[in-house]
């Protein structure tokens, strides 16, 4: 009887880690092939978890992201607080104007006074402050970080590292900068556009 064996794997990893073994397999079975080696580029993003969710949809890339499962934001390493990324639509001056706003970041945070004069930025600050307070209180109640993280906001800062070939980065830019399939998410665009410009400057595109 004739038997055929099929091996499915990540060829990119095999070529990097076991090139001699791969060549031996090809020679033994008489397979004719023409390997292509394409430049791979690693990029480190500092962004929010909403943007990282968009970026991580590019599954051809090799992504790594900081974990909220084991990070305890009540510890000194994180200065006992969560870190929030400011959305693209809020500029620095607007945020500065609200540094001493009427938003009361305290345990009386549940609408402690009249909010009729609040604007969208007040509500945004208030919402994230409520989330931080609830997260810390859940930890005090004995919840583990991996349970308490369920209520962390999409504005939460994250570190994201992506490694991809130039062709995969081109696909990334098609969607996240050039909008070939529809308008890019505005926060994703703000992250991706400077990278796109840098790739062009270096002649990668």
Describe each PLM feature range.
Residues 1-205:
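Family-specific signature for flavin-dependent thymidylate synthase
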């Amino acid at each position: 009887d004739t038997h055929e064996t099929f091996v499915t794997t990540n060829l990119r990893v095999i070529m990097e880690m076991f090139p001699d073994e791969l060549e031996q397999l090809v020679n033994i079975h008489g397979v004719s092939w023409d390997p292509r080696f394409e430049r791979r580029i690693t990029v480190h993003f500092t962004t929010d978890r909403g943007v990282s969710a968009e970026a991580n949809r590019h599954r051809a890339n090799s992504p790594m992201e900081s974990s909220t499962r084991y990070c305890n934001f009540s510890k000194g390493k994180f200065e006992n607080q969560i870190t929030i990324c400011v959305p693209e639509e809020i500029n620095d001056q607007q945020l500065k104007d609200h540094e001493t706003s009427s938003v009361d970041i305290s345990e009386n945070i549940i609408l402690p006074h009249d909010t009729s004069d609040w604007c969208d930025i007040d509500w945004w600050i208030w919402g994230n402050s409520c989330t931080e307070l609830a997260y810390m209180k859940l930890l005090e109640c004995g919840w583990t970080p991996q349970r308490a993280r369920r209520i962390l906001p999409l504005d939460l800062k994250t570190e994201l590292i992506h490694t991809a070939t130039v062709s995969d980065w081109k696909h990334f830019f098609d969607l996240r900068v050039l909008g070939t399939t529809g308008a890019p998410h505005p926060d994703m665009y703000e992250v991706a556009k400077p990278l796109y410009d840098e790739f062009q400057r270096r002649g990668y595109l």
